[in-house]
């Protein structure tokens, strides 16, 4: 098997969409926005991205119940390419673990 792992922390920036497949598998889709400072070649640089997330299966649905727009989360999983209705491809993070980060409030 070839490595395909991604761990990304970010803020939920689009409302969650819940669906159930014809096979009865629940899916939750949302988007997180990541912002950080990283070091590359000895220099600091700003890193930013928006990543669509798909959380499938009953176990992950429990993890997503308390997530809303503005929630800070760390998502671990694998990436895959999905074709949108307009024919364009986009990377999607398929969640295997979701951690809600306490804001401290």
UniProtKB/Swiss-Prot annotation:
<comment type="subunit">
    <text>Homodimer. Interacts with PriA and DnaT. Component of the replication restart primosome. Primosome assembly occurs via a 'hand-off' mechanism. PriA binds to replication forks, subsequently PriB then DnaT bind; DnaT then displaces ssDNA to generate the helicase loading substrate.</text>
</comment>
<comment type="similarity">
    <text>Belongs to the PriB family.</text>
</comment>
<dbReference type="InterPro" id="IPR000424">
    <property type="entry name" value="Primosome_PriB/ssb"/>
</dbReference>
<dbReference type="InterPro" id="IPR012340">
    <property type="entry name" value="NA-bd_OB-fold"/>
</dbReference>
<protein>
    <recommendedName>
        <fullName>Replication restart protein PriB</fullName>
    </recommendedName>
</protein>
<dbReference type="InterPro" id="IPR023646">
    <property type="entry name" value="Prisomal_replication_PriB"/>
</dbReference>
<dbReference type="GO" id="GO:0003697">
    <property type="term" value="F:single-stranded DNA binding"/>
</dbReference>
<comment type="function">
    <text>Involved in the restart of stalled replication forks, which reloads the replicative helicase on sites other than the origin of replication; the PriA-PriB pathway is the major replication restart pathway. During primosome assembly it facilitates complex formation between PriA and DnaT on DNA; stabilizes PriA on DNA. Stimulates the DNA unwinding activity of PriA helicase.</text>
</comment>
<dbReference type="GO" id="GO:1990077">
    <property type="term" value="C:primosome complex"/>
</dbReference>
<keyword id="KW-0639">Primosome</keyword>
<dbReference type="GO" id="GO:0006269">
    <property type="term" value="P:DNA replication, synthesis of primer"/>
</dbReference>
<feature type="domain" description="SSB">
    <location>
        <begin position="1"/>
        <end position="102"/>
    </location>
</feature>
<keyword id="KW-0235">DNA replication</keyword>
<dbReference type="Pfam" id="PF22657">
    <property type="entry name" value="SSB_1"/>
</dbReference>
<keyword id="KW-0238">DNA-binding</keyword>
């Amino acid at each position: 098997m070839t490595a395909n792992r991604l761990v990304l922390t970010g803020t939920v920036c689009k409302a969650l969409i819940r669906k159930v497949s014809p096979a009865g598998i629940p899916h939750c889709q949302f988007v997180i926005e990541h912002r950080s400072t990283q070091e590359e070649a000895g220099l600091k640089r700003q890193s930013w991205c928006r990543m669509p997330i798909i959380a499938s299966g009953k176990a992950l649905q429990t993890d997503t119940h308390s997530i809303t727009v503005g929630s800070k989360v760390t998502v671990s999983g694998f990436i895959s390419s999905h074709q949108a209705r307009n024919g364009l491809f986009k990377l999607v993070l398929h969640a295997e673990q979701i951690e809600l980060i306490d804001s401290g409030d």
